[in-house]
């Protein structure tokens, strides 16, 4: 099955960003063209635009674009997620301890896929060292869309945080990250806690480092 932006593997941080930026610019340009070319009745404008097809097979189509058409709302969702993904990759690339690391897998459009993670990073010896799930959630409610539960499951932390030498992150919006990491949450028996790290990017993307509840001193 084709995706709006196809997965790719075995690439360095720089090349990954170049590919994603090109695909992102294309999606934005096609979405804008759809809006400009629309002529919907004002009384049904919102529902019509939301479902309006965006043509993805016109113009200079980047190699990562896998679909020929997609609903406007889904194109917007993927564009926002890719913006978070690019912020996350830039942040990982800037960390001194990640020098020489590269991307084993990148899945820009395959959210909630239990077969892998949105971003998998390896070290110079080809060992997996980082797993990351990426989302752009417009909510300050930790239970929004059950997204956290899905990401935690995909990262293998729903029962315990594996002590396998792999660091695990959720890359998301500031408002959602703050809700997830809040010490005021009803943590109960959750086996994990978060360390919230701001990327200092212009879009307020945050990284949530997942830690074992047994080892974390921040929050209860």
Labelled PLM ranges:
Residues 27, 88-97, 155-159, 183-187:
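Hydrophobic, Leu/Ile/Phe/Ala-enriched alpha-helical segments that form helix-helix packing faces
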Residues 101-125:
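Active-site metal-binding core of divalent-cation-utilizing nuclease and nuclease-like domains
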Residues 134-191:
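Catalytic cores of nucleic-acid endonucleases
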């Amino acid at each position: 099955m084709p995706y709006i932006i196809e997965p790719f593997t075995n690439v360095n941080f720089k090349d990954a960003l170049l590919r994603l930026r090109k695909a992102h610019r294309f999606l934005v340009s096609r979405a804008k063209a759809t809006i400009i070319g629309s002529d919907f009745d004002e009384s049904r404008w919102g529902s019509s635009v939301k479902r309006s097809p965006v043509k993805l097979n016109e113009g200079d189509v980047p190699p990562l674009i896998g679909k020929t058409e997609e609903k406007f709302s889904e194109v917007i969702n993927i564009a926002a997620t890719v913006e978070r993904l690019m912020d996350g990759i830039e942040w990982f690339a800037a960390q001194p301890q990640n020098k020489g690391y590269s991307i084993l897998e990148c899945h820009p459009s395959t959210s909630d896929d239990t077969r892998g993670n949105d971003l998998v990073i390896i070290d110079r010896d080809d060992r997996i060292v980082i797993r990351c799930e990426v989302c752009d959630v417009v909510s300050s409610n930790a239970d929004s869309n059950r997204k956290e539960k899905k990401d935690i499951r995909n990262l293998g932390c729903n029962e315990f945080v594996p002590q396998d030498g792999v660091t695990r992150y959720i890359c998301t919006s500031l408002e959602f990250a703050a809700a997830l990491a809040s010490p005021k949450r009803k943590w109960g028996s959750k086996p994990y806690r978060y360390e919230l790290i701001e990327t200092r990017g212009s879009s307020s993307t945050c990284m949530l480092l997942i830690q074992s509840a047994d080892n974390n001193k921040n929050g209860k």
